[in-house]
Curated annotation (Swiss-Prot):
Catalytic activity line of the entry: L-lysyl-[protein] + acetyl-CoA = N(6)-acetyl-L-lysyl-[protein] + CoA + H(+)
Residues under site feature: Interaction with histone H4 N-terminus: 198
InterPro entries documented for this protein: Acyl_CoA_acyltransferase, Hat1_N, Hat1_N_sf, Hist_AcTrfase_B-typ_cat-su
Protein known as: Histone acetyltransferase type B catalytic subunit DDB_G0275159
Species in which this protein is naturally found: Dictyostelium discoideum (Social amoeba)
Pfam families registered for this protein in UniProt: Hat1_N
Domain N-acetyltransferase stretches: 169-366
Disulfide bonds: none
Amino acid sequence: MTSKIKSSNTLLTFDANEVTNIKLVWDIEELKNKDKEDKAHIKDEEEDEDGPVSFHPSFSHQIFNDEQVQGYEACKIDIYMGAGSLTSYIDTNYTLQSKNLTNVEGELLKVFSKQDPPISKQSFYKFIEEKEKSFKPIGKKIHEYTITDKESGEETEYEVYFGRITDQAVFRYHEKLQIFVLWYIDGSSYIWTDDPNWDIFFIFEKRIIDGEKRYGITGYSTIYNFYHHPEQTRARISQYLILPPYQRMGHGKYLFNSIHQYYKTNDGFYGPVYDVTIEDPADDFNLLRNYVDLKNIIDEKLFDNVILDLNANNKSVFEEIRKKLLVPHKQSKVCLEIYLFSKFLATPNSNPKYKEFRIAIKKRLYKQNIGDSEQIEKMKQQVAQENEDNLRLEQEELQELQDIENKKNGTNIKVAINTKELTTPSEPEKSKEEIEKDRLEEIIQLYKDLEENYHKTLSSLNLITK
């Protein structure tokens, strides 16, 4: 490695997220400026705008145990990647040859692209200088948009591209890109790319450097195509990520709308797309989804004929929304909840209609959350009973075999039964009243959280004052 860091005899432990720096490099000048900073001993957090964009991962537990790196010297992990090509170079002093306990380089190589693994520093510098500028976005361009910086007024152009995993260029590029989901989506895993049902949408930033167009990755989403009878496709968003330097800028809504717009006019794997669903969305993604879906519904005036009652039959309205916007019925109901909530904001809590509205939502939350937990508890009890029955059966069979041996030998030996006692709760069992009270408190908290999220969505849509 190029840097020399003083070692000690004391075992040190480092937070893997804090010591890892991911750097997106657009141009060789950024690397030259970085080298000057290194010589001047300037720390990463003191970098000026002339160096590469640098940021830390949010998660690393799928790469390093407990998100920790252990060794006998200060840990350095700098991961350089071409902003567009994602060609990479790992600069770390925790290698297989070092005496440190964690082989950082080895662990990272396990999760990086196998077709395009990290290269040496010399090769990386040469690639950035000679080839990075020739990188072109992968797939088919389907949309473009401009974002204006609120402070400087500077406009930046972005382009959205679509590709299928069966396209070898898309497959290979995704293999280099997918490491970001381990760093930024908790509990994520790599998709099974041998399955042809995967679609991928990419966002690229466009810059002009030395009079030439340059492109850098901004974010992406993976979509799985499910079969929907008859001869239709149900598109499910699986992974959805905007890279840290581009977050809180509005890219999420542009990508979300681009996905829906594409599938409205293009077939999925099995035929026309029936709707677009989400796989296990996080809270932040739900906020984005609710904002975009409700805005589109209002812009298309699709709630103009809706019955303002959660208990009413609005199936025909929801079906029209699905056909025009590819929003599933269930999500349309959520949007209706938010829309109705805006109508009751200036209404006293004692208002009968508002009271009915709150009760209807709490009933849904109860069924959605408590109902599921009751089912899980029943399943746990069934499994425990099955295990107990199986254990008893094994013990009986064992005793029968021993009885046969006893008769042969004229002895009377009893098998030492290895009974497995059921674990008793450490606390006294709660009464039905106490259990129900806990459940109601849970629902009340869920409702409060829901109200807060609905407020955020309505504020974003300027339907209420922040």
